[in-house]
From Swiss-Prot:
Pathological condition linked to this protein in its record: Immunoglobulin kappa light chain deficiency: A disease characterized by the complete absence of immunoglobulin kappa chains.
Record GO cellular component, one term: IgG immunoglobulin complex
Name assigned to this protein: Immunoglobulin kappa constant
Subcellular location: Secreted; Cell membrane
PANTHER family assigned to the protein according to its UniProt record, in alphabetical order: TAPASIN
Natural source organism: Homo sapiens
Disulfide bonds: 27-87
Predominant localisation class: secreted
Domain named Ig-like: residues: 6-103
Name of encoding gene: IGKC
Reported function: Constant region of immunoglobulin light chains. Immunoglobulins, also known as antibodies, are membrane-bound or secreted glycoproteins produced by B lymphocytes. In the recognition phase of humoral immunity, the membrane-bound immunoglobulins serve as receptors which, upon binding of a specific antigen, trigger the clonal expansion and differentiation of B lymphocytes into immunoglobulins-secreting plasma cells. Secreted immunoglobulins mediate the effector phase of humoral immunity, which results in the elimination of bound antigens.
């Protein structure tokens, strides 16, 4: 199987979730190979560690690629203290890391 770079998407928390007092930001990587991919979360350019969770789907039988979602979970109060949310993806198929981001309040 040849190397395939992931497509990367970022999703802000939903209004419904924020009403419940938490905020999950999701970074989604689709259709990549090999499985090794690294996701780093940055909030206002500060690297986050420890409050994100990753799950990788097993190889897709149709085209032998993987998908991965990484979820950064914060309290609503923490989420509202910061503005720029970004996930940075490193993968063999990418010549340089790919960053997807959004500004809170501009979605």
């Amino acid at each position: 199987r040849t190397v395939a770079a992931p497509s990367v998407f970022i999703f802000p928390p939903s209004d419904e979730q924020l009403k419940s007092g938490t905020a999950s930001v999701v970074c989604l990587l689709n259709n990549f190979y090999p499985r090794e991919a690294k996701v780093q979360w940055k909030v206002d350019n500060a690297l986050q560690s420890g409050n994100s969770q990753e799950s990788v789907t097993e190889q897709d039988s149709k085209d032998s690629t993987y998908s991965l979602s990484s979820t950064l979970t914060l309290s609503k109060a923490d989420y509202e203290k910061h503005k720029v949310y970004a996930c940075e993806v490193t993968h063999q198929g990418l010549s340089s890391p790919v960053t997807k981001s959004f500004n809170r309040g501009e979605c």
